[in-house]
Amino acid sequence: MVRVALVGARLNRMSATPISAAAEASDLELFEGEARLWTRAFEPTEATQLFDELRRDVKWQQEEVLIFGQRRRVPRLVAWHGDPGASYVYSGTDHLPEAWTPALARIRDRVQVLSGARFNAVLLNLYRDGRDGMGWHADDEPELGPNPVIASVSLGATRRFCLRHRRRKDLKLDLPLPHGSLLCMSGETQHHWLHAVPKTRLPVGERVNLTFRLVTLR
């Protein structure tokens, strides 16, 4: 059972596509948003195998961003994969997609079945320990369209995933995303909510996060 700290949201449980008997979905009824959580979209053994393959086969890179005229390293390793032409601009950098690996294609296909959405690209983030994190942001780039579906798979160590409403400071969520989980955000969520993976001083292992999306092909 996942402990969910909710403010301004309600959690409903419903059956998911019968890929696994344990693949139960929880609807997060967000104010001005939609989200659904599968805490066990992938069985532990399968999730560990996928984690190992991605850790080994993906060409991880540590990127730099320009902040107030200074170049600083992003506190995580990243990679971008997808269909030909699925390039994507984020953090001021234009990313050209690497081809789908067998593990990525396998995860993508499972996510598409569970979510009912189609995806042509994925952003991967490798959080090496608690010193790696992701600041507050929304996935609202023009390439994603007006109301994008963002499907986030977590493999490895459990990390906190935080959301807060852009205007209503009293509306917040704090979700621990476990190994093999899937969180799908849709509707107007990216217009009204920001999300982050905060750093932590607690000892924590490596985590691979994959955010699948449908981008406009160039």
Please give the residue ranges for each predicted region.
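Non-heme Fe(II) oxygenase metal-center motifs and adjacent flexible, charged/small-residue loops
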Residues: 2-218
